[in-house]
């Protein structure tokens, strides 16, 4: 073993107790005192180190998606998509790429029950030969807001009251009463899918519109969908109370136990595609993440399969320190001008540096599994071995060069600097279509949940009236039923 290349690992554990520096500890049961009943001595370094380490075990939890569980596996291409993208990991059917996936709730704290009504996160990290590619999505295909500048506000509204630390619907409906685009997501939130049975029976969506680019430079808009092969299953409200009361980590345990038993969960990756030349032809804006692309207009096409066949080895190292970033794309995949997507490109790396440190990408779970090279040096907790003498670019002593240029979207943008709302809001059509697609019993469950939430005492008559009017514009019969049960007259 080269002592200068040694890295700490439990595979190198000694048979006896030591300090973090490797010094032997002969007694880990008693502190050092002056006599058997005297005061503890400050020179008991092992005790000081043990306590200091303990009081620093926890790191800042994620501001959203704090409660979650990860698993490892592979993604395998099953269908040829080289006409759409030059991405190496999608180069041919049969190609496999290692992945790690993290499932999560969104709003509630680390350790909260996994049976609460809440969107779920579905984040996938592909360790490709061209670098890491992260699809950081949810189990809903839409989101509450369309402009990233409102992201802190919507999270604050859904988070607990800063005075009482209690989550309250009056705060949620007050904030969202200024944002009718949130109706689309509430049509998922208060639906049966608002509480998945577990992570294995849950859909995933990339939510944003991405761009695929082929070798010729042709750009295609794309939406990513994960479809569980075992089907979608949800918990009804009474079931969720029973399950959560018996085991607040039921989804985590289900995922872990299923993989351990060899019952590997699997999802099909499906895509919807659109020619950017057609984006102005629809009643909605295809880059508006509060909208779905109707499947009758944009059918799903299969791409590959995701199989999770290995549990993580250490929850803290591979779940808490796992960091996703929508900005991590590979050649052949790029961003769109979705306003929330654009904000996330900055926000995720920023929060990971706060939570994990400037060198979070050196952590094994986050580091790419391919060679890489840059001059990003030093900083706290830098443990990368480097022996170069040149830490600048360009140099005649270091032959490193620019990478081969890859095609990216090159559409010309023009316009004035301004802060404005998109032209095609179309806030009511899709939630109404979704409601009308349900069977009557499902409609009734949705209505009951909505009525219960809007019946919170602190919600004013004005706010209730706004929501009744909006849902009436989505579907007249829904609005009438809601108005009757809330004793509110629609005001359209």
UniProtKB/Swiss-Prot annotation:
Which residue intervals make up region (Disordered)? 1-32
- In its UniProt entry, the species of origin is given as Ricinus communis (Castor bean)
* Family membership noted in the UniProt record: Belongs to the catalase family.
* Residues reported to bind heme: 348
Top EC class, one word: oxidoreductase
Q: Which gene underlies this protein?
A: CAT2
Reactions this protein catalyses: 2 H2O2 = O2 + 2 H2O
Q: Does the keyword Isomerase apply?
A: no
Q: What is this protein called?
A: Catalase isozyme 2
Could you name the active-site residues?
65, 138
């Amino acid at each position: 073993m080269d002592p200068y290349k040694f890295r700490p690992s439990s595979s190198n554990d000694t048979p006896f107790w030591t300090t973090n520096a490797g010094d032997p500890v002969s007694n880990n049961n008693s502190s050092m005192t002056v006599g058997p009943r005297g005061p503890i001595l400050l020179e008991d370094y092992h005790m000081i180190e043990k306590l200091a380490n303990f009081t620093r075990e926890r790191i800042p939890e994620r501001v959203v998606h704090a409660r979650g569980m990860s698993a490892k596996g592979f993604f395998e291409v099953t269908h040829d998509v080289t006409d759409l993208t030059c991405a190496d990991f999608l180069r041919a059917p049969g190609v496999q790429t290692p992945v790690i996936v993290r499932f999560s709730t969104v709003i509630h704290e680390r350790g909260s029950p996994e049976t609460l009504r809440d969107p779920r996160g579905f984040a996938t990290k592909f360790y490709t030969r061209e670098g890491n590619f992260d699809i950081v999505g949810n189990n809903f295909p839409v989101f509450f807001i369309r402009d990233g500048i409102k992201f802190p506000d919507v999270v604050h509204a859904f988070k607990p009251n800063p005075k009482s630390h209690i989550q309250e619907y009056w705060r949620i409906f007050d904030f969202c009463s200024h944002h009718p685009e949130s109706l689309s997501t509430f049509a998922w939130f208060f639906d049966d899918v608002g509480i998945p049975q577990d992570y294995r029976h849950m859909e995933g969506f990339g939510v944003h519109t991405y761009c695929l680019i082929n070798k010729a430079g042709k750009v295609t808009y794309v939406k990513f969908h994960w479809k569980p092969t075992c089907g979608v299953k949800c918990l009804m409200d009474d079931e969720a109370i029973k399950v959560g009361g018996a085991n607040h980590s039921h989804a985590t345990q289900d995922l872990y136990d299923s993989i351990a038993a060899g019952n590997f969960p699997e999802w099909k990756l499906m895509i919807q595609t659109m020619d950017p030349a057609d984006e102005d032809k629809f009643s909605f804006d295809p880059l508006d993440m509060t909208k779905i692309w109707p499947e009758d207009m944009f059918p799903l096409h299969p791409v590959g399969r995701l199989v999770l066949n290995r549990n993580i080895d250490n929850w803290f190292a591979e779940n808490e320190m796992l960091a996703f970033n929508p900005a991590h794309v590979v050649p052949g995949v790029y961003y769109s001008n979705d306003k929330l997507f654009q904000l996330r490109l900055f926000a995720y790396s920023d929060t990971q540096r706060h939570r994990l440190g400037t060198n979070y990408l050196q952590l094994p779970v986050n580091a790419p599994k391919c060679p890489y090279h840059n001059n990003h040096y030093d900083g706290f907790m830098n443990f990368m071995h480097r022996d170069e003498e040149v830490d600048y670019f360009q140099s005649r002593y270091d032959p490193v060069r620019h990478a081969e240029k890859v095609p990216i979207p090159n559409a010309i943008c023009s316009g004035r600097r301004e802060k404005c709302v998109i032209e095609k809001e179309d806030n009511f059509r899709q939630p109404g279509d979704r409601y009308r697609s349900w069977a009557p019993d499902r409609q009734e469950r949705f209505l009951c949940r909505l009525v219960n939430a809007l019946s919170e005492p602190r919600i004013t008559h004005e706010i209730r009236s706004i929501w009744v009017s909006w849902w009436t514009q989505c579907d007249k019969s829904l609005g009438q039923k809601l108005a009757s049960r809330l004793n509110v007259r629609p005001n359209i």
